Structures are given as structure tokens and as C-alpha cells.
Amino acid sequence: MALAHSLGFPRIGRDRELKKAQEAFWKGELDEAGLRAVGRDLRKTHWELQKNAGIDLLPVGDFAWYDQVLTHSLMFGVIPRRFRPQHGPATLQTLFGMARGVSDGCCGGAHAQEMTKWFDTNYHYLVPEFGADQQFQLGWEQLFEEVEEARALGHAVKPVLIGPLTYLWLGKAKGAEFDKLELLDRLLPLYGQIFQRLAAQGVEWVQIDEPILVLDLPQDWKNAFERAYNQIQREPLKKLLATYFGGLEENLGLAANLPVDGLHIDLVRAPEQYPTILDRLPAYKVLSLGLVNGRNVWRCDLEKALATLQHAHERLGERLWVAPSCSLLHSPVDLDREDQLDAELKSWLAFAVQKCQEVAVLAQAVNQPQARAVLKALEQSRAVQASRAASPRIHKPAVQARVAAITTKDSQRRSAFTQRIAKQRAGLDLPLFPTTTIGSFPQTASIRLARQSFKQGKLSVAEYTEAMHSEIRHAVLVQERLGLDVLVHGEAERNDMVEYFAEQLDGYVFTRFGWVQSYGSRCVKPALIFGDLSRPNAMTVEWIRYAQGLTDKVMKGMLTGPVTMLMWSFPREDVSREVQARQLALAIRDEVLDLEAAGIRIVQIDEAAFREGLPLRRAQWQHYLDWATEVFRLCASGVRDETQIHTHMCYSEFNDVIESIAAMDADVITIETSRSDMELLDAFKAFAYPNEIGPGVYDIHSPRVPDASEMANLLRKAAQRIPAERLWVNPDCGLKTRGWPETEAALVHMVTAARQLRKELA
């Protein structure tokens, strides 16, 4: 009998109940008992949803009040000193303090732990902080309490733990430098204690997640796996080692031979590893095949997956398990909530509940191939695949022909930067250290209300347009009064930097309830790319043209780049990411050319997610970087030399991609640098980056307003690394989340600092 199981389920709830409860608790509108009751109800519902879908072995421990890595930190006693309670054990207040920071109270004020991306997903985890003298102590009873809950409800459960090597890898050494592997022998006894307690609760199987096995691991970490699991094997319970987000590659032999009872592999991301693992797996081990995509929204091709399963079943028999490729945390919860999608498009989709049903039907197809439910599901799957293959909504010959006709010349500016910049400086006539902002201004309650009223039909097109024009007039007047050199229209009409454009492109669709957790209470609802992408009409031109008509100063057009549009959407699975990126690039190229034709002389194309697209394996980086830089140039290279192309990137590591950033050939790049004290510019100096740079002179993520002298000092440091004539002056990022008073105060100081530097260098 093939067994159906799940590696994890979304925790937020079908209607984001967890988010609402968290935020009510933080505001003091819900007490701890109320919050815990919401969590208990969600877990009960989610276990029932999975069981009713046909999952045999339910995950427990995938629920988290904020983040699963943070939950493990509390369980292991990895609580930074600034958050430790003065008396008694850690509490929910401790957990939320670690996640969000503490402004007062028991800790006397403490900044939150660092947050970063969970592998190459759009989920973020709280980075554990380790000291050289780190001690681990079992605390935080959540896992054991939830096992008890599930068993009391009659469920067969499989607790989920992050493995010891992955947990250490994800953390950061704080204070004195030391090797994190030195902590392994101190951490391993806790796993033994956990397994013993779970065994006493009647648990048979435990899932140990070690996704770092799909990374390029140093040899000492590979050696540590053998040492750790040789120790762990002595403890009770059957152990399923789970890997996902990629292929095991050179770690395949290591993973196959670790002394555990089963191995899970991701056959969505790395189907090529299947034949080898089948040959290398010891005869006593269970093999769990991740055949249903856990991080996208499209229905599985059941016949294709079943062919692999049937082959595996011939070799493995009872040792075959079926699962999603990874935790369903990265998928929306339940497609049945979607009541406004048309029937055809909805038939192509599967959210977490439906993915569990697909896993269950695949297992049943192995066990009972002639069962009526199996035959019906396979017939429906064939119909879905045929519908998608032939649908004119998906396949647009004109778009495909345009992509096929792209030439190398299309992604090259007409002249080299040195020639372009001379023409741009002559035409723009900007001072040394020109000042600008990154694009967005504060999104006030009145802006959000106007947008909502328009969507609900309460405002006419004319009324909404006038409301947005009023906001644009205000933004332009403020910038002129403050003395900024290059203005923006403020983006009042934009709800989100991806959604705004996706709503206007053919090939995108939106859901009502397709929410996924980004971190904590922050949920996002990514757009879905379902077909070939094109731009039926101009998207920003009228807003920017209106803004330019209000001022004699240079107005900057603002667009989101193709890579960011792709990375922050659910992509298609039937064509490659680079093909989708090229389609997006052509649509954006048309917009850039329309802006230029409307008299806009600077166009900014934001690529906030450029670095996020990097594959997990270094060997695959260059291919990605080649097409990612090419599609940026494709959307930017149709303009005349006199038109200046800007891009903005907001992350803190450039050294390993600096050549590719240069290859994008943007005339100006604006970046986050204020928190690094301009040290990030060392990468640009060492590489001799040739184009212009706007290093952010203040951190927009903080309400603090730095004074002009502080910003001037940062500019002096920047001028030591980059020639002054190539420096721009701007904030770190957009100002959407800030209030107007602090925005104006900070920009006054920024303009003052720029003027001070001009005097010094005159």
C-alpha cells in the first residue's frame, strides 16, 4: 500500500484567521486565551481538511504563531539575552518580542531578530542568534501539546522538526567568531529528548526536514551529517528525512545512506534524481516522492505523476509514500473559497486542500487502480491538461512570434554609456549630487479609501481620476517646495508595485482568497500568470504625463521590471521562467517607449527581486544571471541615448552579482546603503562600476529622521568610493509606508546635505 502524507499545511486559515487574531492580540483587543483558541480551532480545521482529502499521516508541528524556525529557537532555548524573561519560562510575549522587537516592558527595549528568505521562496524566517557559549535546553511545549491535541482527535500524526544541521545552518554566529558546527554536539541531545517524549506519546514516525541537502555544502557539513545521524539513529521513532526545493545532486549518496528509515525527495524541482535514488536507496528504507508541486497553484498532471509512481511501486512495494514536493505553506489554502473565477480557469488550479486530494488520489491509484474515484480523477486531469494545451486564452501566437523574433540588438542600447551620459547631462541639466526619491510617497487613508471606493463602484472614473490628480498635485508641490531636482508623481494610484501592472496585462489573473504567508501576520496574494503576457494599453503614461504638465522640472516615470514581476507572481509551469520574463520585458519595453514619446526623459525600472531569483546552486547562477540581465536590457534598450534609464535594487549583498548588475547597463542604479554606512559601495569601487549610482542616504524602514549632517557624512563616504560626478542623492527605498511629516522632514535634510556637498566640491 502506497501511503499519502503531507509535509506541512498553511497555518493562516482560509480567511486569514491567524493574521487577524495576531494583530488583535498585539493591539490588546484579544487576550492570550482568545489567541490560543483561534490557533486550536485552526489546527483542528486543518487536520480535518487534510484527513478528509485522503491524507493518511498528518503533519503536526507545522503550525507556528509567527514562524517555524522561531518556534524551534524557543524549543531549543535559543533566546537572545535581550529577550529573556526575568522570571519563569518563555511566553508568547517572548516569542513575539523576538519577532517584532520590544519597545518597553520587561526587556527595556530590544530590536527584533533578523529576518531573511526561506531558501528561494517568498517566505521569511527569523534567523537564530548563536553565541560561542550557546547552551541548548528543551523548553516551549508547543510540539508536544499539539501532538496530544491531534491524537485526542483520533488522527494518525507525523511530527515535523527542522533537522539539527539545517537549524544551525540557518542561524548566525553573534559576538566572537566561531564555527557553528561546534554547537552540534550540544544540540543533538535535545533531539534525543524530543524523540523520547514523542515516542511516549505514541508517535511512530517523525519527519526531520534537512533542505540544506539540496545546497552546495562544505565538506565539514557533509561529514557532520553522518556524525549527527549516527547519533540520532539510537533514539526511538522511525525517522523520515525530508529534502525539498531542489535536487540532492552530489549529496544524493550521503542522503540515501544516512541511518534513517525513510527519505523524501522533491521530484517537481528535480525529477532527474528519481532513477538514481531508486538504485541507491537501501532496501529497508521508505521513499517518499514529492510529485505534487507544493509551491505553485496549478493542477498536477496526474497521469504523468502516476507513471513515475507505478514504476516506483514495482521496485518499492510497501515502501512507497506519496507527498507534495514541499510543505504546502507556500500555497493558498482552499480553491473552494474562490467564487468569482470563471469555471475554465478554476479547473486548472489547485490550492493546498486540492493538492492533498491529488496526493491521496495518486496513492489510491497505486493501491486500487480501477477504483471509480481514481478513474474519474484521471479523466478530469486529462481534460484539464488538454484544455490548457489548446486554450487560446493561454497561447497567443502574436506574443510567441514577437518573442521568437527578439535579436541580440534588441537588448543593446544604441551607444555606450560614456556617449549616452554626455547627451543626458546636456539635456537634463542637473546639478552635482542631483536629488530624487525612489518613487512612492505616503499611501494615506484617503488614498486607500478612494481606491477601494472606485473598485466597489462607489466612485466614477472621473471622480477617481480627480482624486488621484489631487494627490499627484500635492506630491509635485511638496517636491518643488523642498527643492528636489528630479520629481516623481508619487504612485498614489498603485496598490502594489506588481499588482498594479499585472491587473493591466493580458495573461495575468487574480484570486480573492489566494493568500500565502510572507512572515508573521504579513500575507500576500500573488497574481497568477496563466498565459502568454502582453500589454493591451498604456499603463502609466496618462498619470505621468499629467504630473509632468504640473512642473518644469524633470519628471521620472516609474515601472516594475520583468524579473520582479515574475518572482512575485505564481508563474506558469508549461513554459520556462525566462520565456515568461521575455514576454514581460516586451510589454514593459512598450510602456518605456510610450513614456519617452510622451516627453518623459527619465524612466526608472525597479528590479527589487533581481537577486532573489538566484538558484540555490552556484552552478546554475550564470544561466539565470544571463537571462535576467538580458530581459532588463530588452525592456530598457529601445529608447534614444538622451533618455536616462534608472533601476532600483533593495538588498544588501552585491559582491557576488556586481558583474551582472553592470551588465544590466542602467544609466543610474539606486540602492540601499545607509544601514551599511556606505560600505556596500566597496563592491562597486572594487569592480570599477562604470555607471551612475544613487546610494540611499537614509533608512526609510525607520520613522527616525536623521539630520542633514549625518546624511552629508554618508555622502562624503560615498564620494571616497565613487566619483562625485557619478553620485545621486536619494532615500534607501520608496516612501509608501511613511507618514508625510517625517517624509518631508527627512527630504529637507537630504536636500540640505546635497547642497552642502555641492559647496564643498565647488
UniProtKB/Swiss-Prot annotation:
5-methyltetrahydropteroyltri-L-glutamate binds at residues 16-19, 117, 522-523, 568, 612. L-homocysteine binds at residues 438-440, 491, 606. Binds 1 zinc ion per subunit. The keyword Disulfide bond does not apply. Its EC number is 2.1.1.14. One of its GO terms (molecular function) is zinc ion binding. Pathway: Amino-acid biosynthesis; L-methionine biosynthesis via de novo pathway; L-methionine from L-homocysteine (MetE route): step 1/1. Its cofactor is Zn(2+). The active site is at residue 701. It is an enzyme of class 2 (transferase). The keyword Nucleus does not apply. It catalyses: 5-methyltetrahydropteroyltri-L-glutamate + L-homocysteine = tetrahydropteroyltri-L-glutamate + L-methionine. Keywords: Amino-acid biosynthesis, Metal-binding, Methionine biosynthesis, Methyltransferase, Repeat, Transferase, Zinc. L-methionine binds at residues 438-440, 491, 606. One of its GO terms (biological process) is methylation. Catalyzes the transfer of a methyl group from 5-methyltetrahydrofolate to homocysteine resulting in methionine formation. Belongs to the vitamin-B12 independent methionine synthase family. This is 5-methyltetrahydropteroyltriglutamate--homocysteine methyltransferase. The gene is metE.
